[in-house]
A protein has these predicted regions:
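Iron-sulfur cluster-binding electron-transfer modules in prokaryotic oxidoreductases
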Residues: 1-191
Length: 191
């Protein structure tokens, strides 16, 4: 495939990533598999890049695992997500930044559902208000932590204490991050 064709195809998958003021939400399971990953991410953004990253201690899991195993109904997961969005806006943030790929998929699926079926969004508003007295707004920006790191990759590399290079050739190492197939499985243009 010619380079122009690759660039054109790749451009279909580009999305807007916020520059700052991230409302970060930890994964309920990722840290079990990759201890320190969330803390390291926050350290890179705050200490190395000087970004405003807020982590709310009242945030709850998205219940994605329960949803995908058909234990948690879709109406419930929408209300949980709406509550998390409410917490984000309450703290003055609008850029939602999940660490978990399952959560990212859930948030994306729900935003798409609300876009195509506004009655679902209204039903969720009603449930959330009745259950918690809260209201919510959708995030201005939804980006997985890998998206944010990719956006700032050159700035991170320039400030890196240790360079990832081949010691024999001095050339940069080629690396890849497997973030999980469900990151963009249902909505490839959102991943």
């Amino acid at each position: 495939m010619k380079q122009e064709g690759k660039k054109r195809i790749w451009s279909d998958y580009q999305k807007e990533i916020a520059d700052d003021k991230f409302y970060f939400v930890r994964s309920c399971i990722r840290q079990t598999f990759f201890p320190g990953s969330d803390s390291t991410y926050i350290k890179i953004l705050r200490d190395v890049l000087g970004k405003d990253v807020y982590e709310n201690p009242n945030h709850t899991t998205c219940t994605g695992i329960g949803y995908h195993t058909e234990v948690v109904p879709f109406e419930t997961i929408q209300a949980v997500v709406a509550r998390n969005y409410s917490l984000m806006r309450e703290k003055g943030y609008e850029n939602y930044n999940p660490s978990c790929v399952t959560s990212f998929g859930i948030y994306t699926e729900i935003l798409e559902t609300w876009h195509h079926f506004p009655e679902e969004k209204q039903k969720t508003r009603d449930f959330l208000k009745k259950a918690t007295g809260r209201e919510f707004e959708e995030p201005k920006n939804l980006a997985h932590t890998s998206d944010v790191l990719f956006k700032f990759r050159e700035e991170i590399a320039a400030k890196a204490k240790y360079k990832l290079i081949n010691k024999e050739t001095g050339k940069p190492l080629k690396v890849v991050d497997h973030i999980g197939c469900h990151y963009s499985k249902m909505f490839p243009n959102k991943g």
